[in-house]
Design a protein with these regions (language model features):
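Short, small-residue-biased leader/transition segments that mark boundaries at the very start
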Residues: 2-3
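Soluble "head" domains of membrane/secretory-pathway proteins
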Residues: 11-139
């Protein structure tokens, strides 16, 4: 169980919510995963996996392997902080992650974080357990 301490995943997850993370196992595009970055646990959404080509337009539209992603979980599209060269091919054994709050999230769009090693993933966020009025699965 983890307590969320940032706003990069709003509107899906909010500050001070408690979530349950299923240890390791498999994950796929669209899943929210927890991983270590600089001794801190971050939560982000898997956008692409090894070999995929990611492109992000100025308006924030995300394209993976030539197909525009349907992202109902994103409130407002934004390019956000991005200093990688696009289009970008995800390296072997890595995943490309982005926060749902695109204008403020620092994620794989930056060289600072980059793509996440699959082995750094702690697990998939599967359940919100607090606040009680929002208890349920996380998509």
């Amino acid at each position: 169980e983890m307590c969320i301490r940032d706003r990069s995943m709003t509107p899906t997850l909010h500050d001070d919510e408690l979530v349950v993370c299923r240890k390791r196992g498999s994950f796929q595009k669209g899943d929210i995963v927890a991983f270590y970055y600089n001794n801190k646990i971050l939560l982000k959404r898997v956008i692409a996996t090894a070999g995929d080509v990611v492109d992000i337009k100025e308006d924030g539209t995300v394209i993976v392997n030539g197909k525009t992603l349907n992202e109902p979980y994103v409130d407002g599209k934004a390019l956000g902080e991005c200093d990688i060269e696009l289009p970008y091919q995800v390296p072997d054994e890595r995943i490309f992650v982005m926060g749902d709050h695109r204008s403020t999230s620092v994620d794989s769009r930056t060289k600072r974080i980059g793509c996440i090693a699959e082995e750094a993933v702690l697990g998939k966020v599967s359940l919100r357990i607090y606040p009680f009025k929002r208890i349920g699965t996380v998509d």
